[in-house]
């Protein structure tokens, strides 16, 4: 009986060789283990994008994974660039591989932000490869003698030729040529299979990917397609038969694999952040920051080229933003006034007398605690701070905290609103450093949710910044640390239903019309399995009659989840002590000025690599703008609503009953986190009365509590309709504040500790399983451990099942309590502004778009319902942004005068900011006396003048919109001379007067909003009397009453947790009506529900207390509605 030879596949591409490989890394690793390979080298083209995923699977399978990449190399062989596989033999070789991949994407000696290259243009010169050859093994799939000689000179015994047999014409000649060159030059020849798939069945999809890459169809691709499915993973037995004449080629492959001993586990937790140091004597003030580059340090004679920050430090000048009642009133933040003796005694003082590492962190925490608590902190806080600092020191995370502190310090020094959130708000250290705004000790938050020595993973601090000013913060990080040591985390954009259908359909040769009809059948995220014969028939397609349509659907399902391209993560930054490009390749992002690493956040987490999340939050921008507006337009001195300092959210008056009463009425359009349909339905039932109620409100409308069946029990208990009970008596201290119902991740962790005997570290591992995507199977596998632990404590039967069900719900994502509390601060601040300063709040929201749940026209209608006068855009009064003015158009409000909201020029669709600024610059010299004067002074072209006229922005100069448009058409194209002072060359036509509906339609088409009135008010007289109810009237109808409603569609939602139910919000002149469209109704009326801007809906009233919905039986487009470009916001 013969034994299969040892064999390792050295040349394997995954789907992260974008549009080349047709299998996921995990599929390749799993298949390699199944086939009994002794190792597998993942070598994607110009990247290490999929290596961490492969590594995670290889650990599970016990398969040696060789780290490699297939580089496109210029200058190795004659003609066009050649492919060269490089495999890492050791850590030094891995660093060199990352540098070479970075060089391929970024070019030589790149500084600043290198320009992005198309993937087909990415290449690295062979000279760079030769210079970085140490620790790398080169595998060349060619036979050119000169190229082989150059490889041998550069790599010596670490070079080999690769040969493959795919049963195609001409390949035997290539195999013989390679073997001949190898013998002649003393270079080994190894058998590989140039793997593109893990199974032969995936070859059809690989053909489609090839067509997508080349922009062709399978009918026209010709030789671009592989002639068969032989480029798949093969086992040793099959290869031994295929290469019976050359067994030494298989042995050579196994030998090369044995030489490549580097494993990804070697970089786990590697590279702490650069040290931050503060000069002795610089602790008492200033924010001056100085740092030396490695080159400068070398010139100064420094022995290390590791950059460090040498700061003159101060805490943020902003007091803590905490309207919660337990938050103390804070004094102004002091500087750090450390004595020289205390600094010198600390072991963290370096030889130059500067504070660094733990010494600096401890000193910052000491002074920060005095700042937060107005003196020495309470004993429980001091104990918690000491415990946290000891753990930070033992785990070596001081630089991480100091780096985040420095970034926050920079933002505050520039007047940028920011606030930490997420699990970091569980940390008292983060609170006293000014990173977060929630006092975790007073709120009883669980620190282990943030850092745990038991689980041994790095902390994760998320900081939100004003989204319009976040770029300043990002560029500060690049500048401070250098682009070779700082990069943004990537996000892998994958194929979804619609994009998969489009690409596959085009590749299979479907007509553009067929592709469009197919793509319109699904939303971007819908499961293609829902596309059945009925939907195909609606689109005029028949799968039974069209093999290509059937194949398109089948292949698109396979393609879903494949990587399509890289994007930028919402805010993750990796910052390292040694060059980042020695840990992970860097490449330019599509956005100018950004560079990204080739791994996403899950890859970094898998390897325990630190990242800092610097996120943009639109509400912080809106709050900053609103506070600035109030500072400029202060109410009268006698006003009962004081204006807070524009940089200090903490000075907003706390615990105002009027604010809670407003939120309890679901009057929350524009308010952070509580403006969705679900939150507005919850509000009348929850009736928030204090800050902690807002914390619960933020957390409860989440997939975790919804899927765990926790919302209704909590509300019933809150209303006294259900007795508060605990499935296990010792859980009462954990669940008492939420009436026996777990709503937060921290509660789920404590529940596992108390009810099942988990250690805190095990409980956090459970939390990780619960919140990780694809976690349901893992959580179900832990049920035995949970049930056994509960049984030991006498919990069984229904109680045990209830606890497990609640835990299982958190696999659908639940909020940590600290995160909900951080967001609740912004809920309160935005609600206070809406309640007492609706004009400033609405103005700030308009100027911060795009953000939030509603389009500008809904924000304007809501402002009008709150008594705000809104005036339209006008070249004589509007700024670029929307603004506040007084009773006199274009002039500030006088003391005691109500502010009026003026829509800005930015609202005009398609109008460039440069054109708007030119108008404002010209107007600064004096008001415009006529349209002709406007054109002359602002140098407006005909196109922009016409756009202004269409938008009604010439109202103060030409009140009649149609006449203004007519006159604007007479302007010379270059904005120069006018015909007879804007009179047309022929007598002006007698234009009919525009109707009110025409005016509103024109407003929506050009600006997306109208200040003249709601379109429904214009069409209601034609709807047939009182038969069609207004949104306001719905509240007076009894439960299950038949009803018809009509309105403008402002929001469509189809949440994953709703099991196919679609929620539609209709707006009319009185408010908003919420429609519930069940799956069967949606399927019958899908095109109307998804596409009609105005709807007429018939159904029945559904009442639950003060919450009123309409359960829809049928819908139709509203025929009488004016034709306008009204855009709803769709959420899937």
Curated annotation (Swiss-Prot):
CDD domains: DnaE_OBF, PHP_PolIIIA_DnaE2. Keywords: Cytoplasm, DNA damage, DNA repair, DNA replication, DNA-directed DNA polymerase, Nucleotidyltransferase, Transferase. GO terms for molecular function: 3'-5' exonuclease activity; DNA-directed DNA polymerase activity; nucleic acid binding. Its EC number is 2.7.7.7. It catalyses: DNA(n) + a 2'-deoxyribonucleoside 5'-triphosphate = DNA(n+1) + diphosphate. GO terms for biological process: DNA repair; DNA replication. It comes from the Bacteria. It is found in: Cytoplasm. GO terms for cellular component: cytoplasm. Belongs to the DNA polymerase type-C family. DnaE2 subfamily. NCBIfam families: polc, PRK05672.1. PANTHER family: DNA POLYMERASE III SUBUNIT ALPHA (PTHR32294), ERROR-PRONE DNA POLYMERASE (PTHR32294:SF4). DNA polymerase involved in damage-induced mutagenesis and translesion synthesis (TLS). It is not the major replicative DNA polymerase. This is Error-prone DNA polymerase.
């Amino acid at each position: 009986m013969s034994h299969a030879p040892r064999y390792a596949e050295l040349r394997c591409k995954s789907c992260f060789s974008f549009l080349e490989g047709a299998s996921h890394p995990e599929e390749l690793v799993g298949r390699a283990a199944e086939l009994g390979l002794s190792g597998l080298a993942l070598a994607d083209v110009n990247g290490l994008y999929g290596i961490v995923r492969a590594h995670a699977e290889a650990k599970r399978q016990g398969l040696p994974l060789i780290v490699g990449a297939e580089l496109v190399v210029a200058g190795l062989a004659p003609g066009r660039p050649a492919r060269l596989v490089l495999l890492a033999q050791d850590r030094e070789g891995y660093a060199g591989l990352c540098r070479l991949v970075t060089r391929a994407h970024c070019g030589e000696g790149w500084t600043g932000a290198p320009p992005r290259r198309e993937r087909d243009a990415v290449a690295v010169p062979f000279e760079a490869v030769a210079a970085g050859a140490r620790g790398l093994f080169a595998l060349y799939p060619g036979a050119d003698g000169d190229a082989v000689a150059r490889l041998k000179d550069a790599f010596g015994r670490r070079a080999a030729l690769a040969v493959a047999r795919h049963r195609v014409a001409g390949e035997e000649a290539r195999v013989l040529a390679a073997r001949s060159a190898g013998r002649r030059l003393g270079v080994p020849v190894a058998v590989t299979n140039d793997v593109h798939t893990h199974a032969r069945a995936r070859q059809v999809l690989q053909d489609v990917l090839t067509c997508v890459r080349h922009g062709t169809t399978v009918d026209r691709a010709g030789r671009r397609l592989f002639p068969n499915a032989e480029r798949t993973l093969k086992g040793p037995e099959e290869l031994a038969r295929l290469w019976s004449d050359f067994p030494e080629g298989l042995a050579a492959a196994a030998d090369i694999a044995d030489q490549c001993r580097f494993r990804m586990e070697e970089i786990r937790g590697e590279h702490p952040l650069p040290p931050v140091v503060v000069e002795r004597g610089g602790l008492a003030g200033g924010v001056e920051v100085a740092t030396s580059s490695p080159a400068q340090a070398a010139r100064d004679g420094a022995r290390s080229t590791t950059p460090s920050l040498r700061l003159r430090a101060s805490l943020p000048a902003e007091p803590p933003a905490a309207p919660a009642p337990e938050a103390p009133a804070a004094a102004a933040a002091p500087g750090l006034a450390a004595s020289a003796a205390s600094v010198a005694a600390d072991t963290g003082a370096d030889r130059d007398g500067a504070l660094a590492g733990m010494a600096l962190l401890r000193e910052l925490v000491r002074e920060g605690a005095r700042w937060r608590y107005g003196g020495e902190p309470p004993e429980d806080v001091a104990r918690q701070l000491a415990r946290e600092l000891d753990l930070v020191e033992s785990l070596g995370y001081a630089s991480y905290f100091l780096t985040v502190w420095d970034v926050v310090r920079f933002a505050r020094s520039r007047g940028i609103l920011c606030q930490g959130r997420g699990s970091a708000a569980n940390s008292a250290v983060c609170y006293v450093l000014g990173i977060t705004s929630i006092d975790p000790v007073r709120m009883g938050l669980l620190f282990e949710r943030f850092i745990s020595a038991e689980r041994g993973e790095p902390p994760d601090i998320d900081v939100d910044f004003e989204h319009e000013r976040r770029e300043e913060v990002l560029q500060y990080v690049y500048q401070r640390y250098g682009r070779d040591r700082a990069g943004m985390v990537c996000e892998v954009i994958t194929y979804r239903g619609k994009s998969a259908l489009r690409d596959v359909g085009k590749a299979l040769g479907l007509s553009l019309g067929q592709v469009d009809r197919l793509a319109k059948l699904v939303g971007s995220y819908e499961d293609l399995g829902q596309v059945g014969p009925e939907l195909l028939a609606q689109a005029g397609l028949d799968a039974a009659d069209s093999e290509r349509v059937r194949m398109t659907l089948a292949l698109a399902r396979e393609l879903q989840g494949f990587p399509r391209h890289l994007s930028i993560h919402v805010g993750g930054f990796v910052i390292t002590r040694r060059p980042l490009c020695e840990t992970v390749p860097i490449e330019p992002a599509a956005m100018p000025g950004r560079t990204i690493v080739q791994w996403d956040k899950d890859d970094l987490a898998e390897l325990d690599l630190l990242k800092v999340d610097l996120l943009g939050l639109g509400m912080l921008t809106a709050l900053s703008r609103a506070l600035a507006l109030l500072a400029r337009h202060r109410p009268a001195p006698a006003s009962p609503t004081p204006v807070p300092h524009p940089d200090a959210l903490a000075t907003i008056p706390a615990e105002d009953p009027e604010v809670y009463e407003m939120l309890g009425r679901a009057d929350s359009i524009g308010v952070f986190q509580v403006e969705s349909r679900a939150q507005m339905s919850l509000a009348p039932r929850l009736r928030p009365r204090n800050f902690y109620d807002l914390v619960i409100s933020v957390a409860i409308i989440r997939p975790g509590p919804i899927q765990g069946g926790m919302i209704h029990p909590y509300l019933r208990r809150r209303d006294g309709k259900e007795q508060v009970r605990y499935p296990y008596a010792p859980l009462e201290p954990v669940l008492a504040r939420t009436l026996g119902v777990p709503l937060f991740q921290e509660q789920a962790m404590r529940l596992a500790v108390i009810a099942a005997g988990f250690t805190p570290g095990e409980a956090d591992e459970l939390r990780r399983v619960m919140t990780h995507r694809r976690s349901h199977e893992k959580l179900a596998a832990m049920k035995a451990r949970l049930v056994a632990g509960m049984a030991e404590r006498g919990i069984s039967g229904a109680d045990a099942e209830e606890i497990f069900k609640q835990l299982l719900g958190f696999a659908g994502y639940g909020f940590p309590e600290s995160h909900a509390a951080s967001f609740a601060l912004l809920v309160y601040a935005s609600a206070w502004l809406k309640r007492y300063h609706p004009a400033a709040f609405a103005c700030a929201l308009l100027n911060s778009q795009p953000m939030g749940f509603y389009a500008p026209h809904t924000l304007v209608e809501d402002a009008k319902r709150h008594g705000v006068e809104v005036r339209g855009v006008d070249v004589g009064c509007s700024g670029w942004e929307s603004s506040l003015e007084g009773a006199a158009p274009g002039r500030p409000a006088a003391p005691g005068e109500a502010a009026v909201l003026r829509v800005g020029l930015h609202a005009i669709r398609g109008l460039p900011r440069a054109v708007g600024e030119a108008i404002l610059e010209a107007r600064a010299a004096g008001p415009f006396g006529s349209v002709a004067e406007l054109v002359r002074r602002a140098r407006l072209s005909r196109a922009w003048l016409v756009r202004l006229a269409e938008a009604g922005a010439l109202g103060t100069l030409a009140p009649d919109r149609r006449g203004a448009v007519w006159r604007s058409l007479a302007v010379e194209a270059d904005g120069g001379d006018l015909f007879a002072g804007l009179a047309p060359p022929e007598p002006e036509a007698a234009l009919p007067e525009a109707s009110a509906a025409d005016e509103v339609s024109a407003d929506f088409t050009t600006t997306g909003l109208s200040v003249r009135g709601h379109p429904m008010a214009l069409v209601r007289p034609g709807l047939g009397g009182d038969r069609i109810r207004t949104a306001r009237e719905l509240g007076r109808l009894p439960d299950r009453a038949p009803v018809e409603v009509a309105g403008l569609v402002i929001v469509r939602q189809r949440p994953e947790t709703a099991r196919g139910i679609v929620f539609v919000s209709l707006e009319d002149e009185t408010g908003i009506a919420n429609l519930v469209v069940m799956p069967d109704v949606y399927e019958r009326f899908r095109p109307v529900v998804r596409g009609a801007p105005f709807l007429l809906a018939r159904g029945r009233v559904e009442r639950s207390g003060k919450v009123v919905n309409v359960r829809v039986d049928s819908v139709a487009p509203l025929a009488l509605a004016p034709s306008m470009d009204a855009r709803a916001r769709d959420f899937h």
